[in-house]
Amino acid sequence: MKKIMACLVIMAALIGCSKSDDQGGGLSTPENTLPKKNDDHGGKTLPKGVFPKKIAHKTENGNISYEITNNVQGEKILSTTSISYKRDGSIESKILISFSYEGDYPKEATYKRSKTNGENENYTETYSFVDGKLKNTTLKHDTNPRATKTTTYSYHNDGKLAKVLVEEPRKSSLNGQIMEDIYVTETDYTHTGNVITATEKRYFKDTQGNKRDENTSLTTYTYTFENENLIKVTESTTEYYSTTEYTYDEKNNPLFQNFKKLMDPDYFNDAKNSKNNILTRKTTDKYNYNSSTIVNEHVYEYTYADNNYPLTQKIFRKRTENGVEKKELGETTEYAY
């Protein structure tokens, strides 16, 4: 399931118009709406020359872990195929995602996943838009219609994201008994200048909608932006505090798309969706139970096409050994446009 959703996220991130304004401060692009017919996009859904037709991800030893191929006709993507590989190079699974549209807006996506061991999974996700903004999505499992995941978005009066509510039926154990309930993730957003604060609550409620307060977990995030790039993220719970800082190049990020913002209103919480490409990432985790601190640093290297879009991305982990700084290759991504 995680691989299926990851495939959709990557695919959705790549669809759409790539225009952005070179304004300073926080998020200065249009707020999660498709381009109008009279703007300089000409109402087109897909850009020309910057849309990756194929993306290949490779492990540290150069073997392909998975690759995505997109079927684009005219100004819309009709389908995308994702193939996952085992370590020995053989195919582990295939996912075919097909899209239908209502005008310029996606209406439905169907997922068909097949594994070499004979297991198959089918999903359907529908989208609902109100006043040009995504209002809700519904993900249904064809083999289990009860397991329907819904996501509802609400917005402040200025059009900025206010809340994301995710509800997913699950089975859990209570007092030694297996019971059906609903797992809820509720995230509230506030916007102050170039900082967005998110308060995330996770809890269970029964099928009648009664909340179980004893299972509530609370996490607070802050996102700081500069020139449409996410430069700092903090995450805080009762158990730990984490800070991640990013730096960027001045080139074009193929994942920075208006359509991504339309289909994923909380796109901004992932640095991979920033305007430019990540150069460095430093994460510092502090744990309360033993007062320990763990620091991880990564460096990104690219080759670029003539239009300043990346052809390859390599991610290295930085470490120091006997006073000497070293880099270890973690993964490589290759883009074909």
Annotate the PLM regions.
Residues 1-4, 18:
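Positively charged n-region of N-terminal signal peptides that target proteins for export
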